[in-house]
Amino acid sequence: MRKHLILMTVAATLLTSCGGSKTTTAEADKFDYTVEQFADLQILRYKVPGFEELTLKELIYYLTEAALEGRDILFDQNGKYNLRIRRMLEAVYTNYQGDKTTPDFKNMEVYLKRVWFSNGIHHHYGTEKFVPNFSQEFLKQAVLGLDAKLLPLEKGQTADQLCAELFPVIFDPAVMPKRVNQADGEDLVLTSACNYYDGVTQKEAERFYSDMKDPKDETPVSYGLNSRLVKENGKLTEKVWKVGGLYTQAIEKIVYWLKKAEGVAENEAQKAVITKLIQFYETGNLKDFDEYAILWVKDLDSRIDFVNGFTESYG
């Protein structure tokens, strides 16, 4: 991200030096790249030369909405409690009636911003769990002071029970300490907080996907790329992320916006990319994903580029 920012800045400087005036240079110097800074993070804004002249804003809007609809999926993939923790903290942040200038509230605000940025309670890069600099007593009092309708309660659950369920995940350093554990000699699946395997050991997961592979297949798919592996009645089974499967409510909305984007695609190549991506979301078939990826790589002419879908495997 930082490298891209530098390149954009250099491009803007070159444009200014070639044909701009001193006034233009002065205006460029006044641009504030920093949005906000907290914890170990700095949020930046940057210029996109030519954006105002772009005629494809409708396409960008549709693609952006498709991405936003998948935000909660990412939170859930990063940890099974992330969404409920985020929603509980957001309820406190927006509805708290106490003093919002206290260190406890201010530190909770920083913690929530880190959760927003990292899509969960673990660091986006180091994957270690955040240490909250506010007290359990403060948060419990704040939660219990809210209308129960504002809280992410399970059916029949009370606010006290919500605190009992989520507080160890937030405050106990021994509970889910790493989103991704890579320590030698440990079960990397059981000891990682990410939500791709539920009650499954590393050996069980490796054996499951090994048995699926066809040694004669010269173009194998990325097994497990778009699914969660769980145990049901003692038997391993995949919950595929697709329309009609896991995350269907969010994926249906993603598909809705992608179909909007499909109708205003820049060219036939880009339209083919979007069409195939929609097909992948609808079928969950990893062969469709491979075909989508090939079409995406081949599209070298579209001015608007985007990535949407289950495309990474290091989370």
Model-derived features: positions:
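Bacterial signal peptide processing site
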Residues: G19-S21
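Active-site-proximal, well-structured secondary-structure segments within enzyme catalytic domains
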Residues: D290-G315
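C-terminal motif of bacterial Sec signal peptides marking the signal peptidase cleavage site
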Residues: L14-S17
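Sec-dependent N-terminal signal peptides
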Residues: I6-A12
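N-terminal helix-rich structural modules
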Residues: A28-K239, V243-G263
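Positively charged n-region of N-terminal signal peptides that target proteins for export
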Residues: M1-H4
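Short, charged, amphipathic alpha-helical segments
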Residues: K271-K276
